[in-house]
């Protein structure tokens, strides 16, 4: 038996197929993963993401601590209360311990990390914190519900207080703010993991069930981990343990944009290793692959590139419900003739080489095909 979120009993009552995910008992789907996927692209769906780890960082050194801990620079959030930042948290070798989101909460910060990496993340964050005047508080008292899709925000606004509805109206993309709701502090973030507009809502565990059921009654479809994965892959978003891990640098995982090289005086964990990698010339990169014929691209399949003895590897692959054919992300070697969008390569499938098209890492956003 794994850990359970505050919504576990409701998932069961709604017919959710429960599976283990990073030590948590979570719904894979509620009957049809494909239908749930389309609901998010076309209307609105909701996901229980309470298994994510929320850590509040307070103290006089909170900013300096995060500036050293993360490859991206929280100074970008100065004077932007609620603004969020996506970053890798690296080891000294430049590998990705985890990817995360950090919110500027005024004089403190809220960090959201993955569930499968919770123990090592908290241990690493605590170890680094020993050299700073900071306090780390895990918020296990909060549930998190992601409401995603073109109608997600409009529906959510009808179910919250007037104050919260106004706050949601004024939220910018990648911004999150607290609001008093039902006598408690709720947090509304205009963020997500689907490629659609929507909200990620943090609220007290004891209020999560009632709100989930209100969303369902308003026409928001309960969705499981299966649809969450196909949606994020269509959007070209990384999944920890697939596109990156402790042995993969952000430069090889299409995360170079999350590294704040300036100011040069700012030191951060992994900077020396990334600088050396950059100077030596990047050896691997992440690309998108498309197979418009029959067949499904899957993780761990090898990628053959013309005039290269080194093989690439598919990191994530699936059938795309929105496009009607297979898509994948793949880590490939940087060759003399670069593998760029418009090129082709071959993938090993059942002992045969199948030709696929190379595209930028991203296939569907805001309901529209990018390929």
Curated annotation (Swiss-Prot):
Keywords: Aminotransferase, Transferase. It catalyses: N(6)-[(R)-S(8)-aminomethyldihydrolipoyl]-L-lysyl-[protein] + (6S)-5,6,7,8-tetrahydrofolate = N(6)-[(R)-dihydrolipoyl]-L-lysyl-[protein] + (6R)-5,10-methylene-5,6,7,8-tetrahydrofolate + NH4(+). It is an enzyme of class 2 (transferase). Pfam families: GCV_T, GCV_T_C. The keyword Transferase applies. The keyword Transferase applies. One of its GO terms (molecular function) is aminomethyltransferase activity. The glycine cleavage system catalyzes the degradation of glycine. Its EC number is 2.1.2.10. GO terms for cellular component: cytosol; glycine cleavage complex. GO terms for biological process: glycine decarboxylation via glycine cleavage system. It comes from the Bacteria. InterPro entries: GCS_T (IPR006223), GCS_T_bac (IPR022903), GCST_C (IPR013977), GCV_T_N (IPR006222), GcvT/YgfZ/DmdA (IPR028896), GcvT/YgfZ_C (IPR029043), TrmE/GcvT_dom1 (IPR027266). This is Aminomethyltransferase. Belongs to the GcvT family. The glycine cleavage system is composed of four proteins: P, T, L and H. It comes from Cellvibrio japonicus (strain Ueda107) (Pseudomonas fluorescens subsp. cellulosa). SUPFAM superfamilies: Aminomethyltransferase beta-barrel domain (SSF101790), Folate-binding domain (SSF103025). HAMAP family: GcvT.
